[in-house]
Regions:
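Glycine-rich phosphate/ribose-binding loops and adjacent secondary-structure elements
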Residues: 1-31, 37-42, 54, 263-335
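Conserved short alpha-helical segments that host acidic/polar catalytic motifs at enzyme active sites
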Residues: 1-235, 248, 256-259
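Short, surface-exposed, charge-dense and proline/glycine-enriched linear segments
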Residues: 19-20, 134, 236-249, 326-335
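Domain-start "cap" segments at the beginnings of catalytic or binding domains
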Residues: 232-276
Length: 335
């Protein structure tokens, strides 16, 4: 992505950074064509997973398709034979009778507003936040073991997965079969996470991850109120940029106690008394989130700390999903 591209101009970098605060990344595979009747354009996903080739002929035609040969064309009539490259755009202006290439097109739009100034004044980096004068929570071996049991970690998970990742910084490789039943068919009580599988657009290649495909992936996350995509203004990029979604205790404290104009952080517990129904517990979380929103919070931390023998926690996957859908349903959030 643009973050790893050292060859783009500062204007384009600021342009991409500005819109990254409002747009979710997309990996494709997709070749998108668009037109308003006067101009026609095409853009390819940044991984280049969908082929897109085009001809420009001497008699003023452009032919673009995922494959060569969809239309018969005399080779002697071909002026340009090219392909749309990963993450690139192409624009045909039929009024002016010209083809606008990726570089010119993006420089044009990147120069419309002072995006660099807007980013400098509004975007907040997690790495730039001060560490609060608060003790960072640590755990004894006994406390850690108890927490692992609470959150469903097995001895095998810790030793074959977590320990290996901590040592190597990557998932361990394995090629053994598994006779573990699907979560929905299991006679045990698997964690809620086990009921869900990653969805991705598979063509002929495996899922893309940020370790093996660093050149085309980013792990940055933007936290805060999303701006209006249809209205360019400085306040749109008033968000907190987190470079990695896996947060340390220090990172969480920096967010919890951040003192930056335009940001207000609230913490809502997702723990509940063990004799309470899960449905009532989620409704109580909705009420607390709603109260925090009305008090001006634009960052909400859902906390499962302080679990004990009398309290259990709503699975974090369920809690985050439920709160997200509640905020969308009540028109307090757009995504």
């Amino acid at each position: 992505p643009w973050e790893n591209n050292k060859n783009i101009s500062q204007k384009k970098r600021a342009f991409y950074q500005y819109y990254a605060t409002m747009l979710e990344p997309w990996d494709g595979p997709a070749a998108i064509l668009f037109s308003d009747g006067d101009v026609m354009g095409a853009v390819l996903d940044r991984n280049g997973l969908r082929p897109s080739r085009y001809y420009i002929t001497k008699d003023g035609r452009m032919i673009l398709s995922s494959e060569v040969g969809v239309l018969e064309c005399d080779p002697e009539n071909i002026l340009v034979k090219e392909r749309l490259r990963p993450g690139k755009m192409l624009l045909v202006d039929t009024v002016k009778g010209e083809v606008v290439d990726d570089e010119k097109l993006k420089e044009l739009y990147a120069s419309r507003e002072p995006y660099g100034e807007w980013i400098d004044r509004n975007l907040v980096q997690l790495s730039g936040l001060k560490i609060p004068n608060v003790k960072v929570e640590s755990y004894t071996g006994e406390q850690l073991t108890r927490l692992q049991k609470v959150f469903g970690y097995k001895y095998e998970d810790v030793n074959t997965m977590i320990l290996a990742m901590a040592r190597a910084g990557a998932e361990p490789s394995g090629a053994m079969g598994t006779d573990t039943p699907l979560a929905v068919l299991s006679s045990q009580h698997p964690p809620l996470f086990n009921y869900f599988k990653q969805r991705f657009a598979q063509v002929t290649n495996p899922p893309i991850d940020a370790i093996r495909e660093k050149v085309v992936t980013s792990t940055s996350v933007y936290i805060g109120a999303h701006g209006n995509l249809l209205e360019d203004k400085p306040e749109n990029c008033k968000v907190l940029k987190v470079h990695n979604p896996i947060l340390t205790n220090t990172d969480l404290l920096k967010i919890k106690y951040m003192n930056v104009p335009g940001f207000k952080v609230a913490t809502v517990s997702i723990n509940y008394y063990k004799n309470t129904s899960l449905e009532k517990a989620i409704d109580r979380v909705f009420l607390e989130v709603d109260r925090a929103y009305k008090e001006g919070a634009n960052i909400i931390i859902l906390s499962d700390r302080d679990v004990d023998e009398y309290h259990v926690t709503i699975p974090s996957l369920l809690a985050v999903s439920a709160v997200s859908q509640y905020l969308i349903r009540t028109k307090k959030s757009t995504a």
